[in-house]
Amino acid sequence: MYTISRYGLMALVSILVLAGCGGGKTSVAAAPDTGWAYYGGDAGGTRYSTLSQITPENVRNLKVAWTFRTGDLGAGFPGDEWKSHMTFETTPILYDGTLYFTTGETNVVAVNAATGKLRWRYDANVKKLWYSDAASRGVALWVDDQTSAGASCHARIFAPTLDHRLLALDAATGRLCQDFADHGVLDLSQNINFSYKGGEYINYLVTSPPVVVDGNVVVGSSIGDNRIADSERGTVRAFDSRNGKLVWSWDPIPRDPSNPMYKEWTHAAAKTVGGANAWPPLSADPARHLVFIPTTSPSDDYFGGERPGDNRWADSVIALNADTGQLVWGYQLVHHDLWDYDTVAQPALVDLIHDGQQVPAVIEATKTGMLFTFNRKTGQPIFPIVEKPVPQDGVPGEVLSKTQPFPVLPKPLVRQGPVMPEDAWGVTFWDEGKCRALIKQYRSEGIFTSPGLKTTIEQPGNAGGAEWGSIAFDPVHQLAVVNTMNLPFVGALIPRDQLMAQEMSKEYDGWEFGRQGGTPYGMRRKIFLSPLGIPCVKPPWGQLAAVDMETGQIKWQVPLGNAVLNHWNLGVPNIGGPIVTAGGLVFIAATMDDDIRAFDIHTGKMLWQYHLPAGGQATPMSYSVGDRQYVVIAAGGHGGLGTKRGDYVIAFALPE
């Protein structure tokens, strides 16, 4: 599960951001526009719209076309503490003139795409949030070609919930599809090896939409971090879209001795280690009957002595046969993860021009700030990947990987080197000096510095680099657009007998602690901030970049977001993702200053911005109804990022 820790960012948002109002390339033909039928625009998650009504020349004229309010501000959760965890990360999908999306409480809403008027609403009745922020990124659509257009549940909306259910709803009415699972509700809690046996499954839920391919609805999961080595299993499962019966399941950690990967694990670890789940959105290549899985870190996150080896297939990009669940190929992006460097983004399935030939590819953006690119049929890297030596000073009992994979191209989009005293930054000489003193005190050997008993600077931090917003890809100009963060974390391992004392000590106020049961060490971490709540390293702390994927070169990179009374374009922490359009624009919100922006895709110049009524920690989408192009964003804030909360879905369009 991704984590933007609330420890420190509340101070950061209150001090750092006080928001005011605010050619000559080989071309690949773009697919015909079908609106926005998938979370990522299409099954491959390219976040590209072929619509071009809105252009760099007229984008400044965009106005609010309609606003819808969900009414969900955590009222379904008991107590104000739970409400503060609400996020609104949804991206609507379009089908038959209707937008479908989930709220932060995983209620499902359908609105008229032209007017924003409510068509129907289904209340999921989630009564409790058990860990992390309440996040729900959206829904999936399936149209049953064996039924007529007017039949009940001819088109189905699949919506995951925060209490591990999968709902199948009639797209026309919002009623449960009675022939799916248990009268329209599928219980996802089976065969997961829950670590808590008290009757409530507190650390397993689904935050991203499933993907539907070949009549199967494929579902990942989100699992709580830093708790216990014997955590819930990260099994990916496919269910029949019509009746909800299990078709196949695939566990990224090999449990069966006959699995070729089993020999890379000890018997004890293969039996007990959990996680390596797929909490980001999944992607599909229906023509090749493939589903692409981004797997995350195994348990426990910051100590791996109980799981020696590379730990495949954790921290990997995986291609499975969509009909059988059999592994087609996999590539591990982090060996023996000790940094919570989940494979965090939806794999983007694109067609690249490489050495003059069109190649079916998959691009994976990572928390490390690197883009990995593979032939999606074979798994072979399109740009070479080399294994480089990494620091080897682990704690007693740890078994480190001697090397880690680095793509030759594109170059990293974020800082990866050691944090040095000269990197200290502050808004005053006083806090800059405090940061410089901390840097001298802490360990920092660059990316993949192993966690230790002495406080260590993790750069990039566990929030990225890139995050779940993934990339947006312009197929005509071969440009991948991605937002990133330069936001180091600091952390340390804690001997078990000292954990409680540190948790209770005022010296560590503001730190996040994890027990990491079943290992010799607990952990603590937080964002590396000055006493004033400002990042201790030089800006930009948030950036937007375009990468030419034909050459692997960075075309442009600009700060993303304003800070300190909106006078400094420093680039700020951000959660969300971009989209690109055939009109030559990039749209993105995501930032802590609550603005949505449009950029020229060729230059990175900002052309338009609008101050949202709440944080826009979501990914926009675009579609057309009645010859009018709309851009839609959810604005509801993010609990961990500390942005303003709300319940808005806002559509922008040019004046009629």
Residue map of PLM features:
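Beta-propeller blade signature
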Residues: L169, G174, E232-L246, D310-G325, ...
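Bacterial signal peptide processing site
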Residues: G22-G24
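Phosphate/diphosphate-binding loops
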Residues: Q346-V395, A651-L654
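C-terminal motif of bacterial Sec signal peptides marking the signal peptidase cleavage site
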Residues: V17-G20
